[in-house]
């Protein structure tokens, strides 16, 4: 008995499965034996097929700025009513859904109009779901590469406005009408739908808004009914952390090195120029890296490119300043004359404005040495001419302040001296005059060096202010370049 009961149950199960399969097969033959997938599902030619469209974004893959191409992964939800596929589940043993290949069913041929690679279709032709009552649903996946005009003015603190435009490739506005799908509450889904559980966030771009709009185009004549398309706008904002860490921070640090040239002495013009030129070369490398990232356009210059050009101009001015300061510091009295006005500005006015104390002047520091050397020469001459011991001459010289009497007595004695002695005196006078000229020349050289140093200090503060203010203004422009508040709900709901 037990074995007979098990056999009966097995036969009933197999019979039930075969009946289920036969019902789906019967339904398929019932619907598609006389079905033509090339004809629109309308009873009269003037009728319009209403197409419900819903786009679900699963991944914002990338935005290639250089090629101006947006790559996205989406699901295209398309629904319509086909009266030829109408059936009742009561007639087919409760079968409510029939899955058939997409090539067996009429399709509205919804394509991405602004694609860039010529791939108008979907990535996978999945089955079409035919529901009771003639409702047809198709949800194919697609990876689209669409055009996106990239605005690089505020790169890398920019946001972009990209669009996905869907339309029927074959049918006009009178034959096919595109509308938005509705949610469970009956509200139109007039934006790109994003399921946060299945959405993969992009590491470079954040999606702020993704509204949709249906556009109607009038025909050029009365016989042309026009067209209808659905445009989904993606407002995406760049996440600048990668560029801040890898480009902006190194660029600012390297650019700041050009100011270190002012900490070298004013006479070290060669080393200062070397530092500035090395910074220029480094900035050129950064500019080349940016040029490889952004599109080749002459409509605008990116913010980071403007900053690099600004810093290169500052570095060029610093190189010119180093050359001018070196030229001033190495001047001599034999080649250049110092005007009183220039001395007043560079040696008095500028040091006072910059808080630089002038070097202390000690006029009595060099005079005793010169007087001592002169007295020694005079004593040797008197010892030779007057035939007096040196100790006596020194004793006599101490009775008169600074050797004044000795010099006068020597002049009287030289009147009766021999011509050879006069030659010696002339030689001594020449040596003294040369010494005074050298001391005066040394003072002039010192003044030129001080003027070069004052000019160098002025240029340092000017370059520091220019570099700081210019960098701040340029990057503030990127900071205030925010996505405007649009009258749309956020694309990704928290």
Swiss-Prot record:
Residues 21-239, 292-306, 482-494 are extracellular. One of its GO terms (cellular component) is postsynaptic specialization membrane. Residues 265-272, 329-457 are cytoplasmic. The chain crosses the membrane at residues 240-264, 273-291, 307-328, 458-481. Keywords: Cell membrane, Disulfide bond, Glycoprotein, Ion channel, Ion transport, Ligand-gated ion channel, Membrane, Postsynaptic cell membrane, Receptor, Signal, Synapse, Transmembrane, Transmembrane helix, Transport. It is found in: Postsynaptic cell membrane; Cell membrane. Glycans are attached at residues 86, 161. Pfam families: Neur_chan_LBD (PF02931), Neur_chan_memb (PF02932). Gene3D superfamilies: Neurotransmitter-gated ion-channel ligand-binding domain (2.70.170.10), Neurotransmitter-gated ion-channel transmembrane domain (1.20.58.390). GO terms for molecular function: acetylcholine receptor activity; acetylcholine-gated monoatomic cation-selective channel activity; transmitter-gated monoatomic ion channel activity involved in regulation of postsynaptic membrane potential. Residues 1-20 form the signal peptide. It is a multi-pass membrane protein. Disulfide bonds join 148-162. It catalyses: K(+)(in) = K(+)(out); Na(+)(in) = Na(+)(out). GO terms for biological process: acetylcholine receptor signaling pathway; chemical synaptic transmission; membrane depolarization; monoatomic cation transport; monoatomic ion transmembrane transport; regulation of membrane potential; skeletal muscle contraction. Pentamer of two alpha chains, and one each of the beta, delta, and gamma (in immature muscle) or epsilon (in mature muscle) chains. The muscle heteropentamer composed of alpha-1, beta-1, delta, epsilon subunits interacts with the alpha-conotoxin ImII. Belongs to the ligand-gated ion channel (TC 1.A.9) family. Acetylcholine receptor (TC 1.A.9.1) subfamily. Epsilon/CHRNE sub-subfamily. After binding acetylcholine, the AChR responds by an extensive change in conformation that affects all subunits and leads to opening of an ion-conducting channel across the plasma membrane. This is Acetylcholine receptor subunit epsilon. The lineage of its organism: Eukaryota, Metazoa, Chordata, Craniata, Vertebrata.
């Amino acid at each position: 008995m037990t074995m007979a009961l098990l056999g009966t149950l097995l036969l009933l199960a197999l019979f039930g499965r075969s009946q289920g399969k036969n019902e789906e097969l019967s339904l398929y033959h019932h619907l598609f034996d006389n079905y033509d997938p090339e004809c629109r599902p309308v009873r009269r030619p003037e009728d319009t097929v209403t197409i419900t469209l819903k786009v679900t974004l699963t991944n914002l893959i990338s935005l290639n700025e250089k090629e101006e191409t947006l790559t996205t992964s989406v699901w295209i939800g398309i629904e319509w009513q086909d009266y030829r596929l109408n059936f009742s589940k009561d007639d087919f043993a409760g079968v409510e859904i029939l899955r058939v290949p997409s090539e067996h069913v009429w399709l509205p041929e919804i394509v991405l109009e602004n694609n860039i690679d010529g791939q108008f279709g979907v990535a996978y032709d999945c089955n079409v779901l035919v529901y009771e009552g003639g409702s047809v649903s198709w949800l194919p996946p697609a990876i689209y590469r669409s055009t996106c005009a990239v605005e690089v003015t505020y790169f890398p603190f920019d946001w972009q406005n990209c669009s996905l435009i869907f339309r029927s490739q074959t049918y006009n506005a009178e034959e096919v009408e595109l509308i938005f799908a509705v949610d469970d509450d009956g509200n139109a889904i007039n934006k790109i739908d994003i399921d946060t559980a299945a959405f993969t966030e992009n590491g470079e771009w954040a999606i702020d808004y993704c509204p949709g709009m249906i556009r109607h185009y009038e025909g050029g004549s009365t016989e042309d009914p026009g067209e209808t398309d659905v445009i989904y706008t993606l407002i995406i904002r760049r996440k600048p952390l990668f560029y801040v860490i890898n480009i902006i921070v190194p660029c600012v640090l390297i650019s700041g090195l050009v100011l270190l040239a002012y900490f070298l002495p004013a006479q070290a013009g060669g080393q200062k120029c070397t530092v500035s030129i090395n910074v220029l070369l480094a900035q050129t490398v950064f500019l080349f890296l940016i040029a490889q990232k952004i599109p080749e356009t002459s409509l605008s210059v990116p913010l980071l490119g403007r900053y690099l050009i600004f810093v290169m101009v500052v570095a060029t001015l610093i190189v010119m300043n180093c050359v001018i300061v070196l030229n001033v510091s190495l001047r001599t009295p034999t080649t250049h004359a110092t005007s009183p006005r220039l001395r007043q500005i560079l040696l008095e006015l500028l040091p006072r404005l910059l808080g630089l104390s002038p070097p202390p002047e000690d006029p009595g520091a060099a005079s005793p040495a010169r007087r001592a050397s002169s007295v020694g020469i005079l004593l040797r001459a008197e010892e030779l001419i007057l035939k007096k011991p040196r100790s006596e001459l020194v004793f006599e010289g101490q009775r008169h302040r600074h050797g004044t009497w000795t010099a006068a007595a020597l002049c009287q004695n030289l009147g009766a001296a021999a011509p050879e002695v006069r030659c010696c005196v002339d030689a001594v006078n020449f040596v003294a005059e040369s010494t005074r000229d050298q001391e005066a020349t040394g003072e002039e050289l010192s003044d030129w060096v001080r003027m070069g140093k004052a000019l160098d200090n002025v240029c340092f503060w000017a370059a520091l202010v220019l570099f700081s203010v210019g960098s701040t203004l340029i990057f503030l422009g990127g900071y205030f370049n925010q996505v405007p508040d649009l009258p749309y709900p956020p694309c990704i709901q928290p």
